[in-house]
């Protein structure tokens, strides 16, 4: 990694070099790093387990550089996205790279699914410290896991009046995930308004789709109905 950082600095890519030096997970050089740069990247990838995104569009690394990257990816399971300019790279080498990236993506998906499963289980079991320790490892792209009742971790956190944990999850999840309704068409907002949780309700309202805000559960109630019933002004 040290050689790669020095190479990036010498080629004028100081911002990218500083990012890697500080543990950055993405590399998007805006200039052509060529075959030499690709080889230094390959050497770094053999030891680096933090880089997840690499964009080399515009860099003409050729067959030699691509082969070096493919060889490095054989033992690297952390890089999930790699974009290349395919000029002068054989189909065989490109396919080899694609296979390794797909392998890494599949492994990462399984890992994220396991984290989400553990998170839901921890909240259901009231193991709050355990749940808090898992959240930093959750990737927002994969935060939409649900259990057999179509509940997300957020459903359980809100239903158990866990304000701090709920806000942490809201900040981590996408709008689409926050808006998920369970098997009874209850969103997290239904639970928040039914439990009189005004702070969480406001956080949710500002991070949900309109369709979710208007969702009617199997009892015929919207989240607003519960808010009115509990005399909470939203």
UniProtKB/Swiss-Prot annotation:
Keyword Amino-acid biosynthesis: no
Cross-referenced PROSITE patterns: ANK_REP_REGION (PS50297)
ANK repeats: 149-180, 184-213
Protein name, entry field: Putative ankyrin repeat protein RF_0063
KW Nuclease (keyword) present: no
Native species: Rickettsia felis (strain ATCC VR-1525 / URRWXCal2) (Rickettsia azadi)
Domain of life of the source: Bacteria
Upper taxonomic lineage: Bacteria, Pseudomonadati, Pseudomonadota, Alphaproteobacteria, Rickettsiales
PANTHER family: LEUCINE-RICH REPEAT-CONTAINING PROTEIN, LEUCINE-RICH REPEAT-CONTAINING PROTEIN 34
Keywords in alphabetical order: ANK repeat, Repeat
InterPro entries linked: Ankyrin_rpt (IPR002110), Ankyrin_rpt-contain_sf (IPR036770), LRR-containing_regulator (IPR052201), LRR_dom_sf (IPR032675)
